[in-house]
Curated annotation (Swiss-Prot):
Binds 1 Ca(2+) ion per subunit. The modification 3-oxoalanine (Cys) is found at C51. This is Arylsulfatase. Optimum temperature is 57 degrees Celsius. Incubation that exceeds 20 minutes above 50 degrees Celsius leads to enzyme inactivation. Its cofactor is Ca(2+). The active site is at C51 (nucleophile), H115. SUPFAM superfamilies: Alkaline phosphatase-like. Monomer. The conversion to 3-oxoalanine (also known as C-formylglycine, FGly), of a serine or cysteine residue in prokaryotes and of a cysteine residue in eukaryotes, is critical for catalytic activity.
Length: 536
């Protein structure tokens, strides 16, 4: 029997479509670029529109409304509390990929962000990982710095503590010199070196970078000083040109216009421009440092002679983060005032441990172009993400695929490659959901042109924002005030930027998709009509 493959699944947090070099970016990502050149780049790979829903789909192969993250735990509203599929953690209706692989003899290792439950019975250790070092909440200071919290602390900061767990042990302190990406790289390397060499492994490396707060080692930030002084629109045009040059988008693609709540670059004061450019410099440094840590893991596997027997998948968990956190009352009524009192967000300090910044909608749309909008939206900018596969046994070297794929395909694909059958509807005496995704084995081996055909229907819903897609046709519903509160229709083959609404000219196609939407709601348990968290 041939040797079973290893698996290395790497997830970036809020990475934009064109951030890395292999996808048109200017940020130094030599290790990811090398993986891409030796593998397959996916230009139509889709996730959920935010972090934890995507992670639940990645590790189960089914929709997040089934897996327990119908909405993010941080966003549970009274109408959703207690509803099936809205538990706020990975529930018992699903079996997790590491549980199945461990049962089949794989060593299951994790270092990184979990975001699928905070309690002991919800941690990575409880869901199949033999060894794990993880950040449990959805974000945290990357250096572990936290000012004293009191009743005035905004909800967003209380909900993102530096809460780490190793295996079953919750950590009270973090080591001197801690930085999230380095710590995750260190731990995964430790687990790989300590593993049983006779068994294959599944290694999961979900970084918490480049999610806010934007923080990175100063020496890397300095490498980007001045790089973004021309502003986000200049970067957007630069990246669009590079995407076309690389063949990642069509040469005549029409990019969706920028939609932003902030002023134009030229209308900002000098200090505002300087601080905004510095935030982008720090963001770039976070991406570069993440890439460096990926390189350490890949180099180790290469030296061990394991790399070519390892299926490597890299992806972002959603589109770039364009939210203006201060604009959401749910995050705390005095967020900026609290940050002013407890952090130093002066120009020269931005990016250090005691700073706390994000980069806003214009930089995000420089990264998601030509797509519409960004994270949290069910438009393409929120759900179409960069992804690449390196596995010499199957993927074509240096190839680019424009075929539709979804994060729900990952679990079926890895199980197929491992020769492990999903248990179906029952596992260990309890009823479970079957995967909704499809294996890529036939696609990657060249037997088929794509994993999905034009009849595949895929749905999305989060925060009241909806989408349903079949083939190249996609219907989108964005509630007021963030959208028109009516269904819009797009032909993505001709209009990937979702600019030309065909709802009036193609009423039959829209009606057909709305019927698919109703079936999707029925199958997955979406609760319709709840107040959207982001606009309450």
């Amino acid at each position: 029997m041939s040797k079973r493959p290893n698996f290395l699944v790497i997830v970036a947090d809020d990475l934009g479509f064109s951030d890395i070099g292999a996808f048109g970016g200017e940020i130094a990502t030599p290790n990811l670029d090398a993986l891409a050149i030796a593998g397959l780049r996916l230009t139509d790979f889709h996730t959920a529109s935010t972090c934890s829903p995507t992670r639940s789909m990645l590790l189960t192969g089914t929709d997040h409304h089934i897996a327990g993250i119908g909405t993010m735990a941080e966003a549970l509203t009274p109408e959703l509390e207690g509803k099936p599929g809205y538990e706020g953690h990975l529930n018992e209706r699903v079996v997790a990929l590491p549980e199945l692989l461990r049962e089949a003899g794989y060593q299951t290792l994790m270092a990184g962000k979990w975001h699928l439950g905070l309690k002991p019975e919800q941690t990575p250790h409880a869901r199949g990982f033999e060894r794990s070092f993880s950040l449990l909440p959805g974000a945290a200071n990357h250096y572990g710095f936290e000012p004293p919290y009191d009743e005035s602390t905004p909800r967003i900061l209380k909900g993102t503590p530096a809460l780490y767990v190793e295996d079953e042990r919750y950590l009270d302190t973090l080591p001197e010199g801690f930085y999230s990406s380095d710590a995750f790289g260190d731990k995964l390397l430790q687990y790989l070196k300590e593993r049983d060499q006779s068994r294959p492994f599944f290694a999961y490396l979900p970084f918490s970078a480049p999610h806010w707060p934007l923080q990175a080692p100063r020496e890397i930030v300095e490498k980007y000083r001045g790089r973004y002084d021309a502003g986000p629109e200049a970067l957007r045009q630069e990246r669009l040109a590079r995407l076309k040059e690389l063949g990642l988008v069509e040469a005549d693609v029409e990019a969706h216009p920028v939609l932003a709540l902030t002023r134009e670059w030229e209308a900002l004061e000098d200090e505002e421009r300087a601080k905004s450019a510095r935030a982008m410099e720090v963001y770039a440094a976070m991406v570069e440092r993440m890439d460096w840590n990926i390189g350490r893991v890949v180099d180790y596997l290469r030296r061990q002679g394991e790399l070519d027997n390892t299926f490597v998948l890299f992806m972002s968990d959603n589109g770039a983060e364009g939210a203006l956190l201060e604009a959401f009352p749910k995050f705390g009524p005095d967020l900026l005032g609290f940050l002013d009192r407890h952090y130093d967000n002066s120009l020269e300090n931005i990016g250090r441990a005691n700073s706390y910044v994000w980069y806003g909608p214009r930089w995000a749309q420089a990264a998601t172009a030509p797509s519409r909008l960004y994270k949290a939206f069910t438009t393409q900018g929120g759900i179409r993400v960069p992804a690449l596969v390196r596995y010499p046994r199957l993927s074509r070297q240096g190839a680019i695929s424009h075929a539709f794929a979804t994060v729900m395909d990952v679990t079926p694909t890895l199980l197929d490659l491992a020769g492990v059958r999903h248990p179906g509807k029952r596992w260990r005496g309890r009823e479970i959901a079957e995967p909704r995704g499809r294996s890529w084995l036939g696609w990657l081996s060249g037997e088929t042109e794509a994993a999905h055909d034009e009849n595949t229907v895929t749905g999305w819903e989060l925060f009241g924002m909806r989408a349903i897609r079949q083939g190249d046709w996609k219907a989108v519903y964005l509630p007021a005030p963030v959208g028109p509160a009516t269904w819009q229709l797009y032909d993505l083959a001709r209009d990937p930027g979702e600019i030309h609404d065909l709802a009036d000219s193609q009423p039959g196609k829209l009606a057909e998709l709305i019927e698919h939407w109703k079936r999707y709601v029925s199958e997955t348990g979406v609760v319709e009509g709840a107040s959207p968290f982001l606009v309450r």
